[in-house]
Amino acid sequence: MSHIRSRFSKPADELVVRYTTSLPFDWRLYKEDIKCSTAHARMLSKQGIISTEDSQSIINGLNAILTEIETGSFVFKPEMEDIHMAIEGRLFELIGEAAGRLHTARSRNDQVATDVHLFVKNACDKTINKIRTLQGTLLEQAEAHPQTALPGYTHMQIAQPVLLPHHLLAYFEMLERDCGRFTDARKRADVMPLGSGALAGVPYPLDREMVAKELGFSAISQNSLDAVSERDFILEYLSDAAICQMHLSRLSEEMVIWSSAEYAFVELDDAYTTGSSIMPQKKNPDVAELCRGKTGRVYGSLNTMLTVMKGLPLSYNRDLQEDKEPLFDCVDTLGDSLEVFAGMIKTAKFKPERMLRALEKGYVLATDIADYLVGKGESFRNSHGIVARLVSYAVAQNKTFGELSLAEYRQFSNLFEKDIYAVDIKSALNARNLPGGTAPKQIAQAIARAKKILAEAGVKN
């Protein structure tokens, strides 16, 4: 029977053991746990709390356990309820009674919290790197299609012409904000709880700053009650992940639509599509669809953690064991989504000719014709009404703007002159030459800005 049940006269019910164990999932914290324990043992020796010999024996044993886990020879025993007890149990087997000194001036409460802080810090770094990779692929495609125009949409209706790089860089901007959020979230994870004990601190002369420095933390926690029971840093990661996955879901939706036969704006590479079990002609955008579907999974992780935390009194409660599965699943899901999306976008083949054909539909120059009338002295509101009636007429006549005669134009306003035919896709794009606009000059600047952002982040493009 585990030493933590010394208070009890009989072992836990077998069902209770299965119900309460976290070892099947929190084993993933083994590196963080061994790293924290190593730093703690070293500090205990420096402070004269345990002997140098015991400290070194503990550290040697922990290194041996790390090797066992990473080579697959470590035996995860079901009776050890979590990774922390599994490692400690094995440490006793390797070095004997000296292992019992490791937990001096430490509780599993501050131990677990510190492990998870380290995990989330690392997760933030990895997530940011994966976002940067996806940004790089978007930028590559933007640079490869500097003059490709397509319809911009509102309400899924053709609205105004934009350049493809402008569209792709919109997602670059979303992902840039995601990077900012994860960078900021990392600051809250970069605080070390170790030394807080179970809830009230510890009665030993610890050097918390020494441990924080060895573990790479920028600060130590300032309130032991808060330190062992707060999971804000997890919630912040999950919140940021939900927003990031939502951005990927939006891009997924467009890849699904754009790759359809009705649009055919893009052809997804065979490596990122699947077939049908019955329809031989199918090339399904399953990767994009799954990314869209997995967004609910990431949202679920956030909702799980918010629900776990909503009614917890200070300080530690066993409910907090439920923080790890949603965290791990979210980190994995978002990470996989970012990686697979980078590959899918990198290998996608955009179809400029199909985009150009779509621009010929939907009277995409209507706003520009209204602006033309404004330039002739008409108010915009009157111009809007004139062009709305002009569109209705063109639809009824089954004509494009370019097919209307000047006489037909002048049925709606005498301000129309021959130069109305100079209003075309190229002029519409060039006219939007303000920062943030879709004009070619602005796109060139936007690409240069994106390249600078990635270069400063250490990403080669």
UniProtKB/Swiss-Prot annotation:
GO cellular component: cytosol
MF annotations from Gene Ontology: argininosuccinate lyase activity
Keyword Disulfide bond in record: no
Subcellular location: Cytoplasm
InterPro entries linked: Arg_succ_lyase_C, Argininosuccinate_lyase, Fumarase/histidase_N, Fumarate_lyase_CS, Fumarate_lyase_fam, Fumarate_lyase_N, L-Aspartase-like
Chief place of localization: cytoplasm
Pfam families reported in the protein's UniProt record: ASL_C2 (PF14698), Lyase_1 (PF00206)
Source organism superkingdom: Bacteria
EC number: 4.3.2.1
Any single biological process term in GO: L-arginine biosynthetic process
Pathway connected to this protein: Amino-acid biosynthesis; L-arginine biosynthesis; L-arginine from L-ornithine and carbamoyl phosphate: step 3/3
UniProtKB keywords: Amino-acid biosynthesis, Arginine biosynthesis, Cytoplasm, Lyase
Reaction(s) the record says it catalyses: 2-(N(omega)-L-arginino)succinate = fumarate + L-arginine
PANTHER family, per database record: ARGININOSUCCINATE LYASE
Family membership: Belongs to the lyase 1 family. Argininosuccinate lyase subfamily.
Matches recorded under NCBIfam families: argH
Protein name per UniProt: Argininosuccinate lyase
Record organism: Dehalococcoides mccartyi (strain ATCC BAA-2100 / JCM 16839 / KCTC 5957 / BAV1)
Gene (UniProt): argH
